[in-house]
């Protein structure tokens, strides 16, 4: 099968591309490299540099490949950047997603959309949060990703496509950048590998649902094989505090360095954990990598850089 992966030079997208290549599929990666890296692009993938907000450039990259499946992961993924420049956030995450929807429609290809989980539901959501809880985004990023969901599901209904929305938990693992709006796992790991004090925002009690990137990539393959439309949380359903993440990474590093405390960023949530019951029951997906194991593996990767 021919699979288009937008954002495939990025952290999660490159692992999704790997997963489909390992299955024997042909993969085209479209990425503008604004945050992704050519080093992340798998050797056997075809690469086209294009901006998803430029419909003409996107079509020129995609049409000769004629994908049978589209995995859309290209995004403006920084909460802070979305607050600083909500117009750009909207262009990438809303207009860009619309352009990808149209490219998929022209080829009759179902689209699997990488949505946000935690930034969508808000601090007052029940935990673990089910998919049918009313989204209450707390940032322009959360709002734009929710708008992207609406286009993906509307195109599924309009054009009878088996489009899938995957609301991802906090993904961590090898290849995650520690620069810009990075996850704490990447930031902590890089600082510990250099023997530096990692920055701990807030008091460390804020919680997230940490999912290893290999499990996230497997969810895309599972959704593709199911060949049915749907909306699913992709998560562990387990809340882990930032302080616990730091503790596990310090154990992996054999380090005792104390963190540098810093205030929470604007728009940052106190807690987020998603309910994965639906995807487990309907598609048979469940995470395989426990947090402690995944953090050890992730730190080992950063230690080699």
Sequence positions of predicted segments:
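N-terminal Rossmann-like NAD(P)+-binding domain of SDR-like oxidoreductases, especially those catalyzing
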Residues: 1-171, 214
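Residue-level signature of the cytosolic catalytic core of signaling kinases
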Residues: 50, 54, 177-181, 238, ...
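Hydrophobic aliphatic residues
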Residues: 74, 104, 180, 192-193, ...
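A conserved pocket-lining segment of Rossmann-fold NAD(P)-dependent short-chain dehydrogenase/reductase
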Residues: 82, 132-136, 161-177, 187-211, ...
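Hydrophobic alpha-helix immediately C-terminal to the catalytic Tyr-X-X-X-Lys motif of short-chain
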Residues: 147, 151, 155, 188, ...
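C-terminal substrate-binding subdomain of Rossmann-fold SDR/epimerase-dehydratase oxidoreductases
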Residues: 190-305
